[in-house]
Amino acid sequence: MAHSVKIYATCIGCTQCVRACPTDVLEMVPWDGCKANQIASAPRTEDCVGCKRCESACPTDFLSVRVYLGNESTRSMGLAY
C-alpha cells in the first residue's frame, strides 16, 4: 500500500532521511532554497512501507519529511487494551 510522503521547505538537504529509508522511496534533487542546494524528494511513494524511519532521522525541529498513513493502515493497527 502506498502512503503519502510530504517533504516540507524546512528541509536542510542533509540526506539523513534518504539514508534511513529501507525501500529507497526518497532521493535528493537540486533545489536553491537551502545551503546544501538539494532537497529530499519522494518519487517512489508506491514503495513506502510506512515505517517512518525517515521522520526519525530528520534533524530539523519541524520534521521536514512526514509519512501519512492511509485509513486502512490506521484501522488495521487496532486498539490497545
Swiss-Prot record:
It catalyses: reduced [plastocyanin] + hnu + oxidized [2Fe-2S]-[ferredoxin] = oxidized [plastocyanin] + reduced [2Fe-2S]-[ferredoxin]. [4Fe-4S] cluster 2 binds at C21, C48, C51, C54. It holds the Pfam family Fer4_7. The keyword Disulfide bond does not apply. It is a peripheral membrane protein. One of its GO terms (molecular function) is 4 iron, 4 sulfur cluster binding. Its EC number is 1.97.1.12. SUPFAM superfamilies: 4Fe-4S ferredoxins (SSF54862). Its cofactor is [4Fe-4S] cluster. GO terms for biological process: photosynthetic electron transport in photosystem I. Keywords: 4Fe-4S, Chloroplast, Electron transport, Iron, Iron-sulfur, Membrane, Metal-binding, Oxidoreductase, Photosynthesis, Photosystem I, Plastid, Repeat, Thylakoid, Transport. Its main location: plastid. It is found in: Plastid, Chloroplast thylakoid membrane. GO terms for cellular component: chloroplast thylakoid membrane; photosystem I. InterPro entries: 4Fe4S_Fe-S-bd (IPR017896), 4Fe4S_Fe_S_CS (IPR017900), PSI_iron-sulfur_center (IPR050157), PSI_PsaC (IPR017491). Residues 2-31, 39-68 form the 4Fe-4S ferredoxin-type domain. Binds 2 [4Fe-4S] clusters. Cluster 2 is most probably the spectroscopically characterized electron acceptor FA and cluster 1 is most probably FB. Apoprotein for the two 4Fe-4S centers FA and FB of photosystem I (PSI); essential for photochemical activity. FB is the terminal electron acceptor of PSI, donating electrons to ferredoxin. The C-terminus interacts with PsaA/B/D and helps assemble the protein into the PSI complex. Required for binding of PsaD and PsaE to PSI. PSI is a plastocyanin-ferredoxin oxidoreductase, converting photonic excitation into a charge separation, which transfers an electron from the donor P700 chlorophyll pair to the spectroscopically characterized acceptors A0, A1, FX, FA and FB in turn. This is Photosystem I iron-sulfur center. The lineage of its organism: Eukaryota, Viridiplantae, Streptophyta, Mesostigmatophyceae, Mesostigmatales. The gene is psaC.
